[in-house]
Structure formats: C-alpha cells, structure tokens
C-alpha cells in the first residue's frame, strides 16, 4: 500500500512538473537558464568621429562603438528569427566616473535586463554610443549646445546600431534575429536616446526652437565663430539625425587604431554607417530620461513605455529643467518634456493604441494607472514615488533605483542611491513585469502570438457585484483552479489555490469599501475582472 501511494505521489508530481513547464510561454517567461545564454562581448557595430577624445589619447579622432550580444545559445534554441531588444546605458553622456559610476554597455542594470530578455528568448544587445560634452562650462551656449550635440550623435549611433543589427539579420543571420522586430530600451541618459530616436525626424525640430539656438555671437560648439540665432546643430558638419550627410574627408588610416583619419580642415566630420538599411523600430522604452522637446513627438512614432521617478531631480517627470551633477555641483542645461508629458502625447496621438494597455488589469497595470501623481491616469507610464530624505535637498532623491555598481568605485553609495543590489533587482522585477505584456502586444502587431493568456470562450460570473458580505464566483464551461484578489494599489487581499470547482464563495465583509481586481485561473485560461465592495 505504501508503494502504491508513493507511485501515485510520483505520478502527481510529474504531472505538476509537466503542467508548470507547458504553462511557460516564450517571450513572457524565462524559458532559458543563465547557463543557456551566450554572450558575445565587444562586437563593433560602427565608427564615427568624436571631438571629445582627449589629446593624450590621440583625439579628436574616429572611434569605434561596441555592443555586447546576449542570446540563447544557438545549439540549444532552434528558433531562427528571434526578436531583438537593444539597450542603451546611462551616465549623463559623459565617460564613466565623471558624473556617475555608470556610463557604458557593461553597466549592471543594462546587463541584468539584457540577460532577462535573453532568458525569455530574445536576442538582447547592450550598446555603447559616443560620449562627451562641456557639462560644466559657464557659457550657457556651450553647455546647452554640446549637450544637444551629444544627444544628437547618440541617436546617430543608435541608428547605426539598429541598421547593423537589421543588416546582419538580412544577410547571414548567424545570431538568428528577426529583422522585422527591434525594440529599444534606454536607461537614464539612454532614455533621452530612445525618446529622440523615436521622435526626431526633421531638421526644423532642432533648428527652430529658441532653446536650441545660440543666444550670443561667439565660439561655436564645433569651433569657429557663430552669430546669435544660429542653430546649435549644423548638419553640414555632423550630418542629419539618421547619420547621413556631413561626410568627413578621409585622408588615410591611423597606424595606432586602424581606423580612418579625417581632414579636420574640411567641413564634414560624419562617417555614415550601414547606409541604406532601414532604421525603423517597433517599440521604445525609457527608464528616466526625457523628450528634448514636446514638438518632436507626432502621430506615427513608435509606441512608447515609460518608467520615471516622480521626484527625479535630474530629468523632470512632467516638464522642467535638466540638471547634470559634476563634482558635487549641479549645472542646469535645458527645459524638456518629461515621461508623463511624453506618455500623454503618445497616448492621445494613437501611437500607443497597439499596446492595448487600458484592458490590462494585472496588479502592476492597476497600480501604475491609479498612481496619485499620474494625472489623467495615463497608460504606459509606471511612476515611482520615492521622496528625497530631506525635502530641502531634492537632489538626494533616488531617481535611478534600478542601478547598482562596484562598491569599490570612488563614486559609491549615497543618499541618492544606496547601491543595494537586492533593492535594484526588485525594481528591475517591476520594470520587466510592466514591460513584458506591452512588449507582447507590440510583437503581436508584427505577427507574433504572445501573451494570449485571456481566452474569451468561457464565462465567469461574480454575483452579487457590488458585494457587501460575500459573493459567488461561478465558471461556465471550465473549472476554477485559483482565485486571487488585489486592491487598486496592487496589494493582495485574498488568494485561494487548488480549488478545482466550478464555483467558489468569497467573504468580502471585512474588506474596505472600494474596487478590487479579481484574477481567476481556470483549466482553459485566465480571466481578470473587477469586484466592488460597497
């Protein structure tokens, strides 16, 4: 008899294991392990001129840009066309260590998120871009102009990266990428990159606004002299936002770097990369950062998902001034549109319609929508509410809670970020949980079938609803497996598993009055609905 029960237990265990495996879905769940992931570091995707390479290192000169590739090993994964997510790091557009401990494609946060995407079956790419600007200049034109130029060149690099990725997928596709689905994710400064990448599409957008013009005659950001009213960006020198035009005159090859030498007495300083390959993307995501100007956004831009700290001192949540920290001082740069403003524009314009976020009733979606700072209950923005520990010192707020770094770094833990890996990983959990359902919707628009969790061919009835004492949840045509209930802030108030019945009674008498989100898992899928306690 004992052996019989042991055998039955083993069979049940195997069935449960089989159910858990079959319930996992590629692109939604982590279907690969860390051991299954291959990393290809330091792959060059493009080259271009940088005027901020120090003379001690041979600058100004042409430099390479790198990306690290994270993907399920092709000996394990049989999928031949895998969607791509390209990540861009933070660092205030300055070399690592000048403004923060972050500043390249190997930053902890972008590496962690790249690995998480790869374990879900994506090809994830962490990319560098050109850095450098006169962040602490006392000349407003030089400070503001070089900052705009830094964003501009980073967009050119990002487009070169997308073209390199798509071009590789179209030619030999050794990394088995889908050229028809590429998403971008920017962290901190990388958020400025993804915003500008998605919205900047004509010269007038950087030439016409007064804030992007010289306020006085004097030295220009590319050398020489300029007049008041001239635009900071000169496409004859640096090319357009796609990285075309303004071509440099090549005079030879550096014996040190092996890269082209250019004639700095000539006007052009741009080197086009992967010309002719399309650079359009399917989705952009920002964790912090801002939109350089709200007028950049227009109908037809790619859908956008945003994450932002409400009290971010360095990049505004609504609208406001960009502030950059250098050596304990803060330098104001330019007024921009924050993530909340950008999300509202993208929602109203219809760009985010494809994400269908208003139908999502999971705890993270409900919490994001109902956040008290989210004026208008905008979709597709997740707000973090951390306050600075001292309201008189707003610059101490933790505006990048997903970042952590080497504890031995000279710029180590502070009140602004305690540099606790476990805490940062928890914030990344939230970022992934909010991103994945929306990423799935964008993928479905490109021909995938992701996240089809809710199946409409069975009915769930909750009665009475509103409820004051108890309610009965009944299913028609299916068996209820579990029920979970959370409030509008995403806090769990009720969980019951292993039900295996077509109905279940829930006592609501002790609950506070309000609206609750009920998630019912059945043997034919999941339904999410509302329950009101009156």
Spans of features found by a protein language model:
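C-terminal tail/sorting-segment detector
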Residues: 23, 513-534
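N-terminal cap/lid segment of alpha/beta-hydrolase-fold proteins
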Residues: 25-80
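Gly/Ser-rich "nucleophile elbow"/oxyanion-hole loop immediately N-terminal to the catalytic nucleophile
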Residues: 80, 143-156, 160-188, 200-209, ...
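Short beta-strand element of the alpha/beta-hydrolase
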Residues: 80-91
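Cap/lid segment of the alpha/beta-hydrolase catalytic domain
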Residues: 92-109, 122-152
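Active-site-adjacent alpha-helix of alpha/beta-hydrolase-fold enzymes
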Residues: 104, 108, 302-388
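C-terminal catalytic histidine-bearing segment of alpha/beta-hydrolase fold enzymes
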Residues: 294, 347-449
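Residue-level detector of functionally pivotal "anchor" positions at catalytic/ligand-binding pockets or at interdomain
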Residues: 441-463, 469, 476-478, 491-492
């Amino acid at each position: 008899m004992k052996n019989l029960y042991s055998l039955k237990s083993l069979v049940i265990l195997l069935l449960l294991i089989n159910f858990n495996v079959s319930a996992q879905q590629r692109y939604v769940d982590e279907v690969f392990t860390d051991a299954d992931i291959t990393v290809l570091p330091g792959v060059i995707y493009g080259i271009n001129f940088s005027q901020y390479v120090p003379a001690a290192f041979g600058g100004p000169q042409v430099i390479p840009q790198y990306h690290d590739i994270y993907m399920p090993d092709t000996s394990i994964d049989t999928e031949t066309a895998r969607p791509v997510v390209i990540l861009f790091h933070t660092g205030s557009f300055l070399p690592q260590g000048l403004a923060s401990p972050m500043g390249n494609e190997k930053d902890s946060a972008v590496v962690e998120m790249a690995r998480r995407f790869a374990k879900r079956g994506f090809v994830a790419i962490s990319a560098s871009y050109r850095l450098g600007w006169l962040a602490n200049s006392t000349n407003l034109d030089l400070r503001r102009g070089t900052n705009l130029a830094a964003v501009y060149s980073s967009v050119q690099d990002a487009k070169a990266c997308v073209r390199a990725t798509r071009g590789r997928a179209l030619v030999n596709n050794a990394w088995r990428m889908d050229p028809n689905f590429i998403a971008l994710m920017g962290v901190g400064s990388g958020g400025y990159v993804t915003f500008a990448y998605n919205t900047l599409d004509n010269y007038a957008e950087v030439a016409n606004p007064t804030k992007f013009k010289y306020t006085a005659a004097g030295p220009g950001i590319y050398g020489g002299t300029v007049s008041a009213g001239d635009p900071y960006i000169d496409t004859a020198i640096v090319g357009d936002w796609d990285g075309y035009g303004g071509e440099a005159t090549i005079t030879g090859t550096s014996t040190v770097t092996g890269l082209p030498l250019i004639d700095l007495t000539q006007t052009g300083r741009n080197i086009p990369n992967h010309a002719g390959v399309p650079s359009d993307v399917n989705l952009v995501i920002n964790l912090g950062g801002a939109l350089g100007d709200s007028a950049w956004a227009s109908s037809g831009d790619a859908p956008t998902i945003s994450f932002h700290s409400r009290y971010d001192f360095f990049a505004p949540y609504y609208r406001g001034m960009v502030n950059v920290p250098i050596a304990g001082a803060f330098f104001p740069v330019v007024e921009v549109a924050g993530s909340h403003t950008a999300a509202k524009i993208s929602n109203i314009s219809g760009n985010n319609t494809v994400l269908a976020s208003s139908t999502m009733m999971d705890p993270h979606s409900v919490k994001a929508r109902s956040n008290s700072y989210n004026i208008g209950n905008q979709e597709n923005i997740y707000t973090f509410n951390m306050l600075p520990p001292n309201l008189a010192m707003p610059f101490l707020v933790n505006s990048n809670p997903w970042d952590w770094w080497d504890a031995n770094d000279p710029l180590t833990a502070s009140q602004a970020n305690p540099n606790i890996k476990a805490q940062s990983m928890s914030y990344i959990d939230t970022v992934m949980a909010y991103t994945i359902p929306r990423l799935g919707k964008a993928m479905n628009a490109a021909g995938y079938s992701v996240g089809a969790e809710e199946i409409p061919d069975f009915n769930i009835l909750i009665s009475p609803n509103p409820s004051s004492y108890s309610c009965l949840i009944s299913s028609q045509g299916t068996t209820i497996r579990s029920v979970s209930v959370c409030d509008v802030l995403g806090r769990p108030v009720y969980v019951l598993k292993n039900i295996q019945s077509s109905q279940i009674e829930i006592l609501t008498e002790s609950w506070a009055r309000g609206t609750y989100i009920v998630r019912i898992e059945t043997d034919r899928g999941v339904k999410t609905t509302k329950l009101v306690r009156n």
